[in-house]
Swiss-Prot record:
Phosphorylated by MAP kinases. A motif (Involved in PIP2 interaction) lies at residues 81-97. GO terms for cellular component: cell cortex; cytoskeleton. Binds to actin and affects the structure of the cytoskeleton. At high concentrations, profilin prevents the polymerization of actin, whereas it enhances it at low concentrations. Pfam families: Profilin (PF00235). One of its GO terms (molecular function) is actin monomer binding. Disulfide bonds join C13-C115. This is Profilin-3.
Length: 131
């Protein structure tokens, strides 16, 4: 299965008649492996900050996490594995695998829990596959 197929079939899928606003699979260096059409362009310093938070959990908490210049308040995640952010009625979930970052961005009516489930399920699968 191609990376693009993972994005559309596993991340942009319908969940209780809702779906993510956008999603992507990125390399740890921020290189886009696959993305949905509306996915925002990360800036290099944003990827650096995200990777640092995976290495040093809590790094982004004081300043927030920025994605394409938009600020997200960092909320409870899983240290070293998952970063979650909230912005208004929406948010973001980022799951780190051995080689990739699985990213999902949502807005209401999708819930944070639905976004977490979709992103983390694919991330866990990729980890099992050695990715």
């Amino acid at each position: 299965m191609s990376w693009q197929a993972y994005v559309y079939e596993h991340l942009m899928c319908e969940i209780e008649s809702h779906h993510l606003s956008s999603a992507a699979i990125l390399g740890h260096d921020g290189t886009v492996w696959a993305q949905s059409t509306a996915f925002p362009q990360f800036k290099p310093e944003e990827i650096t900050g995200i990777m640092k938070d995976f290495d040093e959990p809590g790094h982004l908490a004081p300043t927030g996490m920025f994605v394409a210049g938009a600020k997200y308040m960092v909320i409870q995640g899983e240290p070293g594995a998952v970063i979650r952010g909230k912005k208004g009625a929406g948010g973001i979930t980022i799951k780190k695998t051995g080689q990739a970052l699985v990213v999902g961005i949502y807005d209401e009516p999708m819930t944070p829990g639905q976004c977490n489930m979709v992103v983390e399920r694919l991330g866990d699968y990729l980890l099992e596959q050695g990715q």
